[in-house]
Amino acid sequence: MLPVSPQGEPLMNAVLYGVDTRAEKEINELNEEIGKENILQSCGNALTSQSVGPKILWLKKNCPKIYQKVGKILSSTSYLVQKLTNENVIDHYTAANFTPLYDINNLKWTDALTSNIIEVERLPKLMWTTEIAGYVSKVAADETGLAPGTPVTVGTIDAAAEAVSVGVFGAGDMMMMYGSTIFMIQVTNKKIIDERLWYAPWLFKGLHGSMAGLATSGTLTHWFRDNFAKEIPKDKAFEILAAEAAEAPPGAKGLIVLPYFSGERTPIHDPRARGTIFGLD
């Protein structure tokens, strides 16, 4: 989430996705106001730390001076497109994260569930990922070296773009991505609405996305290396640790890790969850 002025200038540092849990209070307030089932059926997603709507409400309550100056609420991709073309747009896949402001049944912004967050006019124009959002402006061309008038597509979230890059196009295709966090995408030909997962229209019309994600993955292995493998040179640590892990028997001799070291996203959606290691001698 990046609030920008009417001129397109950032008003604050961007707020991250599910790993940022600042809007827990606002999530509870919106669930009480609207009802969890109403939110799920209209938006396809439960309100969680992944949701942008509660974070906008947090901004409204905690940073009113910034909120009053907001021209648009953008995503990271929207901001890049805006800088290149002066157009404020967002793809439907990304917009589905704006629960409870995106209506999955009519593919549009909505304030039908609540009018307490922000006017829908201050949200970007909805388009499909592959549509042309605009063209590289003269100013952007001078700054980037791109040719003026180069067409710029709407784009999408990093994980969805990465999914396409490895061949996830149609129903039945799936990707699991390991990075700082873990993200999984399954493309389907019908909506799968489950409060334990995330839903979004897929990048291409007529298809749907069912997603899941863990809050810690690479960040956890880095933490382990820095705290428990200090004697190993950093440039060799992961190679050595991976080799040792490969020798572990099935079940790891009873060692169990609940990787909730930054709360957890799917399937428990609990920012207060804490990491636990069982079975240490």
Task: Spell out what each predicted region is.
Residues 15-16, 93, 213:
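Short clusters of small/polar residues that mark proteolytic maturation junctions
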